[in-house]
Amino acid sequence: MTFIRNLPGPLLIFLGALSLSFGGLIVKSFEGATLWQILFWRSLFFSLTVLAFLILSYRGKTIESFYKSGLPGFVGGIILSFGFCGYVFAMYNTTVANTNFIISLQILFLAIFGYFFLKEKINLITLFSICLAMTGVLLMVGNSLSPGELSGNLAAFTMPITFAVLIMIVRKFPSVDMVPAQFVAGVSSCLIGFLLSTKIMISPHDIFLGFLAGFFQVGFGFIFITIGARTTPSAMVGIIMLSESVLGPIWAFLFVSERPSVFGLIGGAIILS
């Protein structure tokens, strides 16, 4: 897995955002699984994916990698697990548009946290890019926002906040491999899903969707982002991550014929520019 770690940071961030952009489509495609069942299976396959990546990367030193990640890795994993729970809860209880819009606010949290905690200056070009990108997001999803469920909207805020905190930890300790933190997050959220589910077994169709979500969507997504963030400024991470909000509606259009509005197309073009 050395070739992945040698890829440019911004490219890895984009690949991670690309993977994560399928989240809404996958969660909305479950047929009979409950919120907590989705969380359990998604987190289970995610944990296995991260563990497999660590074994392939470290081989006989896999356990040592957890030890070396230390307290930053453990704390980062626990914090991120709340984001995982909030993401599934939001997608289950409110619209994909609402959730994507709220998640896109991570760009603000990243820039602000980076400024205060890492002393990363926000230059005029970056500030302009943030404003331009946020304008694109507002145009893209603002026209289709619905009131939604208050609980789902509030839960969605846990994702950009916990993601920003994780990136701060990654940037603060660039020499520490934070991929083990992803395993901690997966196991923690899997345990939460298990404890809150009345039963674990779901249909084969939904188990397959859980596999897609855990392996492809969040598995590759957060592995790429965690590695890429080590060499990418926090504000730049936020700007690139906005592509998740652009691509999500595109997948909905391609696979479930959900047509984006004219404002959505214009907003997406602004962000990609």
Language-model-detected regions and their locations in the chain:
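Hydrophobic transmembrane alpha-helices of multi-pass small-molecule transport proteins
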Residues: 50, 54, 80, 112-113, ...
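Glycine-/small-residue-enriched transmembrane alpha-helix faces in small-molecule transporters
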Residues: 1-39, 78, 86, 145-172
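Loop-to-transmembrane alpha-helix entry segments
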Residues: 67, 100-103, 119-139, 146-155, ...
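C-terminal-most transmembrane helix of multi-pass membrane proteins
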Residues: 2-3, 11, 43, 142, ...
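Specific alpha-helical transmembrane segments that line the substrate/conduction pathway
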Residues: 37, 43-48, 88-119, 235-253
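Helix-helix packing/entry segments at the starts of transmembrane helices
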Residues: 11, 99-105, 170-188, 218-254
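Hydrophobic/small/kink-forming positions within alpha-helical transmembrane segments
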Residues: 21, 25, 51, 77, ...
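Membrane-interface interhelical linkers
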Residues: 1-18, 46-75, 88, 121-127, ...
